[in-house]
Amino acid sequence: MELLEEVWTQYSVLITYIAIYEPNPFHGNKAGHSHKLSLYNSLYLCDGGEDDQNIPLQPLIQPERQVDVVFAYDNSADFQSWPNGNAMIATYQRQFSHQGNGTHFPYVPDENTFINLKLTEKPTFFGCDAKNLTSLTGSLDAAYDTPLIVYTANRPFSYWSNTSTFQMRYDHDQRDSIIRNGFETASRLNLTWDSEWRTCVGCAIIRREQERRGIEQSDQCKRCFERYCWNGKTDTTFVFANFIDACVQFLKRQFKTLQNSTVRWVPYNPVSWFKYLYTRIRWYL
């Protein structure tokens, strides 16, 4: 009971992290589609990640923007401070709510599938074929205006970059190592894991316009999409760890620059664990 009280006390403190701006700069402003922000003298703001949307995708998927492709880099601390796709799921689910406001987002799987099918181990494309999105959008034209998502999750190429959310200070070596690891993650280890990666990025960028014009993909683009597109399969088996020992041993053999000799588990934090359990329970209800 004491442990639950301690966890709830710390979790309650997090709830109070709301910024109140007064006067509200939008008060009385009738421009735009929504007038809810203009009704009150004060403006209440909080971290956008409070609704699990750690990747700020919502502004980019507005139909008026006519965005063809979005590069989504996920540095969430979902489990063991690694991402498991939960941010993508949150944006996908939001389109079915009132707050979705006419936005469309490609199909994505559950968190376990993200891990089991290794969708966080390499860049993954979602929404590769607009014709498969018409059940979401209602028409093919609207599907063409739904951006293709190039999803890349934080991974340890040369540094264990799953630092705690509560770590506020980094020395220069840590900073440089995290930046280097980010470059290696985004570039497929500077193209050493896939020499065609630059071309594959280009294929993702032009895909929607090709579909609008009825232009068939090149053979190289077809290879890229075969390699990186999520094929719709799922594996909902629960996984306890983001990395299995075999994966860690492989990384050790491949990259001699890893900072630690073993997996660096983020120190136990009751608030993080409570939020994780809440997410799991909510998902299965």
What are these regions (language model features)?
Residues 1-281:
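Catalytic domains of lipid- and phosphate-ester/thioester hydrolases
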